[in-house]
Every structure is written in C-alpha cells, then in structure tokens.
Amino acid sequence: MKQTERRILLGRVVGAFGVKGELKLESWTEPRSAIFRYQPWIVRAPSGQESVINGVRGRDQGKNLIAVFPGVADRDTVEAMHGTEIYVARSALPPPKPDEYYWVDLEELQVETVEGVKLGTVSHLFSTGSNDVVVVRGDRERMIPFVFPDFVKSVDFEANLIVVDWDPDF
C-alpha cells in the first residue's frame, strides 16, 4: 500500500469477547460482516500507534461482530485495544456497480443546482432507511435526498461535482 493512499474508516474495537483474545467490533460496512472481506487492515490505537494486520478472521455472533487478530491470544491484550480504529486502503474496496457510489467517494465533492448556483461541499451522508441524504455545507447546511433522477441529476468525479435539482432557498 502506498503511504499516501486514501484510507477508509470501516470500524473499531469496542471490547473483548471471552478470554481467548477475541475482539468485539463495531462495523460500518453494509452488511456489517463485509468488514472481513477487505484486508489488510490498518489499525490505529487511541495512542496514535498504527500497524498493518493481515489474516483477520471473524463472524457474526448475535448482536456482536467477533474478530480474531493473528497473534492476539488473551483478554488483557484485547482490553488494551479498546477504541482501536480499523481502516483499509481505498483500493481494497471493489469498484462500485454502475450508478452506485461509496459515500466516502462523494465526500468533498462540490454541489450546484441545475441552474449553476453553488450550494457548497458534501460534508457527509446518512441513511434514513428509505433513502440516503447528502449533507451539503456552504453558506448554510442543506440536506438533500440522494435520489436519482428526482433530486440528483449527475455525479461527475472528473469535474468534482454533483448537480442537483434543488431550490437554493430551501
């Protein structure tokens, strides 16, 4: 992995499971167990220390996601890892399907209306269950449903631009 390659935060260690060095994870992938598909992991401890881990295995266990890190075999080691963030290189993710996007790829894109009015920059996205919402920060914050073709007309990564059909006063 190149040192300057973009990293994607996929989850974090939230606790220990049992006494044999298994970890409870919080995963932000969809489905949550997809986190195990993307490796190697770059893990960053709360202290800021980073390391690369290959060969992580895991499983769904009720409400929890359980992981086994190579070389971690006791609960004390796991307890010290609480809060550790899990990243992967952006290149570890498969290309999205046509007309699908990774949220992280949309962040920082400029947003303007079909009339050319600049609304701001994508701060982040969230899901409402029925659709995703793009949060745009400019002269003020706007929340625009990320729905094609009703509100979102185009996404152009080369131009760093999302064009929306949205009233700038709303």
From Swiss-Prot:
InterPro entries: PRC_barrel-like_sf, PRC_RimM, RimM, RimM_N, RimM_N_sf, Transl_B-barrel_sf
An annotated GO cellular component: cytoplasm
Region forming the signal peptide: none
A Pfam family reported for this protein in Swiss-Prot or TrEMBL: RimM
Segments forming a coiled coil: none
SUPFAM superfamilies: PRC-barrel domain, Translation proteins
Transmembrane segments: none
Subcellular location(s) of the protein: Cytoplasm
UniProt keyword Cell inner membrane present: no
Family the UniProt entry places it in: Belongs to the RimM family.
Domain remarks: The PRC barrel domain binds ribosomal protein uS19.
PANTHER family membership: RIBOSOME MATURATION FACTOR RIMM
Subunit details: Binds ribosomal protein uS19.
The protein's name in its UniProt record: Ribosome maturation factor RimM
Species the sequence originates in: Xanthomonas oryzae pv. oryzae (strain KACC10331 / KXO85)
Lineage of the organism: Bacteria, Pseudomonadati, Pseudomonadota, Gammaproteobacteria, Lysobacterales
Gene: rimM
